[in-house]
Curated annotation (Swiss-Prot):
Belongs to the Maf family. YceF subfamily. The keyword rRNA-binding does not apply. Its EC number is 3.6.1.-. CDD domains: Maf (cd00555). Coiled coil: none annotated. HAMAP family: Maf. Nucleoside triphosphate pyrophosphatase that hydrolyzes 7-methyl-GTP (m(7)GTP). May have a dual role in cell division arrest and in preventing the incorporation of modified nucleotides into cellular nucleic acids. It comes from Xanthomonas campestris pv. campestris (strain ATCC 33913 / DSM 3586 / NCPPB 528 / LMG 568 / P 25). This is 7-methyl-GTP pyrophosphatase. It catalyses: N(7)-methyl-GTP + H2O = N(7)-methyl-GMP + diphosphate + H(+).
Amino acid sequence: MMPRLILASTSAYRRELLGRLHLDFDTARPEVDEHALPGETPQALATRLAGEKARAVAVRFPEAWVIGSDQVADLDGQALGKPGTLEQARAQLTRMSGRMVRFQTAVSLIGPDGFAAQALDLTDVQVRPLQPQEIERYLAAEPALECAGSFKCEGLGITLFDAIRSNDPTALVGLPLIAVARLLRQAGFSLP
């Protein structure tokens, strides 16, 4: 019998990505405060939140394997959170215009037997120089208020970039499947 697997996320994008591995899984909302701690780096924030999300769900489902993931946009060492409002999204996109932004995407796997492992994927995005009217058109068409960096790379947001550099093309969407598959194999899951 396959062990129960739970994705600690309600993100449709993460659910779609994990579905690519052809594993049966459920989803559960992790109740976690996503604010950065004083002095916390973007990498430490992403790693901590991925672990906290997995642990928050594992407490509710102690018999299950739980995957938690978090992504933080890193501009010059400063974490850019989910914008939440159009004003914040506009400000983030303006700050990122013509700049390289590093996306720190962490994943954590926790098992019922005490297994715990994490991985981190780094994706560098070169944002092209953006005119104010381009930002306005983008936000009118696709307000990505719940996305790190204020864009959806799997949608119209891809038009905002000059280049993406990553070892895992799924990481920028929010769940680095190469790392997830590696962690699941380490835990004994059968994947090709």
